[in-house]
Regions:
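Metal-dependent catalytic neighborhoods of phosphoester/phosphodiester hydrolases
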Residues: 21-25, 46-63, 73, 78-93, ...
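Active-site-proximal beta-strand elements of phosphoester/diester hydrolases
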Residues: 7-17, 107-119, 160-162, 219-225
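Active-site neighborhood of phospho(di)ester-bond hydrolases with catalytic His/Asp-centered motifs
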Residues: 12-14, 40-45, 69-75, 96-100, ...
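Active-site-proximal segments of metal-dependent phosphoesterases and phosphodiesterases across multiple
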Residues: 126-127, 131, 154-196
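Short amphipathic alpha-helices and their capping/turn segments at secondary-structure boundaries
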Residues: 1-2, 28-34, 87-107, 146-155
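N-terminal active-site segment of His-dependent metallophosphoesterases
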Residues: 1-67, 78-81, 133, 137, ...
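Binuclear metal-dependent hydrolase catalytic cores centered on His/Asp/Glu-rich metal-binding motifs
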Residues: 108-156, 181-186, 236, 243
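Binuclear metal-dependent phosphoesterase catalytic core
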Residues: 2-7, 104, 178, 186-198, ...
Length: 297
């Protein structure tokens, strides 16, 4: 038997690209997420030019969010060299910005890193040749090690990973082939296979696929705002998932006000009743949100 307290509902979105003129642009999205989820995940590119001024505007909108917020920064958030100030500004309104850090909510632990690029599989860049190439690969390796260290510190039954760059090729498919090496790295996948990770959320790939799996079957979700708009044109641009305490994978949320408990649709008011085991296949759905976001990765 599972009750509502045995399930954590996650809302996830990425690449909001807040600019100096974005005040209020995501208020409707944040309001609906607050009503629908237990935790909000933001997977990078929170600002457009990496300016503290942009982060302050986003922070004003996030201050009204009535649920915990967990975030990682993306490449745009590093553009102006103000990433530490951005993290502090967001932290002042309660956002848990992870960079090799962990955060726990009930039975779910969250590990977050920015990640980096380099390509996937046999096409991945190797540390050979000029120093700048070696430094490039080293950055990705360091991000992977940082993720591994964070996962090792989690003691929760379920482990969820946030990153900005993609850990698998599957969720960047749809992007121009020539930019694959700059969208993520399969080196980020390696730590996921060493731990019992429940699900992975990332952004960055604006034209990528909505979901995929690692080689070992871990579900990976691309929650880039632009990708959600493109992949689900009839759905608002954020996704909701229920993470049960048992071994079931994250399940889709059929609609606002309902919670899938152990694989059977129940209203929240009836969530304390008995239910069957969870689904054996990840399903996903978008829930209500608002327009906005940038086209750049």
């Amino acid at each position: 038997m599972q009750t509502a307290s045995d399930v954590v509902r996650l809302a996830a979105v990425s690449d909001l690209h807040y600019s100096k003129t974005s005040q209020g642009s995501a208020q409707a999205l944040f309001a609906q997420i607050t009503e629908s989820a237990d935790v909000l995940l933001l997977c990078g590119d929170l600002t457009d030019y990496g300016l503290a001024e942009e982060a302050k505007i986003l922070a004003k909108d996030l201050a009204a969010v009535g649920i915990p917020v967990v975030a990682v920064l993306g490449n745009h958030d590093y553009e102006a060299g103000e990433e530490r100030e951005i993290a502090k500004i967001l932290g002042d309104v309660g956002v848990n910005t992870l960079d090799g850090d962990v955060w726990e909510y009930r039975h779910v632990g969250f590990a977050g890193v920015r990640g980096f690029c380099g390509g996937f599989g046999r096409g991945a860049l190797g540390p050979w040749g000029e120093k700048i190439i070696k430094d490039f690969v080293h950055e990705t390796v360091q991000e992977a090690l940082k993720l591994e260290s964070a996962l090792a510190r989690l003691t929760t039954d379920r482990r969820v990973v946030l990153m900005h760059y993609a850990p698998i090729r599957g969720t960047v498919e749809g992007e121009p082939l020539e930019i694959y090496p700059f969208l993520g790295s399969s080196r980020l996948e390696e730590p996921l296979t060493r731990f019992d990770v429940t699900a992975v959320f990332h952004g960055h790939a604006h034209k990528g696929a909505a979901e995929g799996r690692t080689a070992t079957g871990i579900p990976v979700f691309n929650v880039s705002y632009a990708a959600l708009k493109a992949n689900y044109p009839d759905r608002p641009p954020f996704r909701l998932f229920d993470v049960p305490m048992n071994g079931a994978e994250p399940a889709d949320v059929p609609s606002i006000g309902e919670r899938r408990i152990g694989g059977r649709r129940r209203s929240d008011q009836r969530a304390s009743e008995d239910s069957s085991d969870g689904p054996d296949k990840v399903r996903s759905a978008a829930s209500s949100g608002s327009d906005g976001g940038s086209d750049s990765t």
